[in-house]
Amino acid sequence: HDIGINQIRLTPPPVIYNEFPEQQLDFALQRKGFEVVRTELTQGVRLDIPEDELLGSFVNKTRTAFRRAEKLGLKFRVIENPTQAEFDRFWEILVENRAGLGVTPAHNRKEIELLHNLVPENLMMAVVEYEGQIISLIWNFGCNSRTVLEFYMAHQEPFQKLRPVPFLT
């Protein structure tokens, strides 16, 4: 019977974010005529590749950018427990990067710090440094034992020519 609803919008998390992937809801909705308008997962990367084969698994453009960044002296560093100064730098680069795209971060700084304080074991920050200065960063969220969500990635525009982002991905 008709209850006056002609459209429902759902944004479920990608199935790989679940500890036990299942798609019963997707199947049931599609069987009733619903359709997927857009999917949020843009890329998935296998992480069980031996480290010495990892670079070879990337597309040529990414491999070239990675090698160039390496030759230019960029350094990759994982930050397990960010200091306040590193958190400040993360926020500064993120806000500047998003402003250049005409947007603001989806979360405010207070929310990000709260998340970090609630589940620090699920969060990982990594940075790319050039001449001792953080120029690019990524903040990852461990969804489960098999999946890591790239929560935020940003770089400083003046250093884009050094191609720091492939170092983070």
Which residues are covered by each model-predicted region?
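Conserved GNAT acetyl-CoA-binding A-motif
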Residues: 3-15
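A conserved beta-strand-loop-helix scaffold within acyl/acetyltransferase catalytic domains
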Residues: 12-161
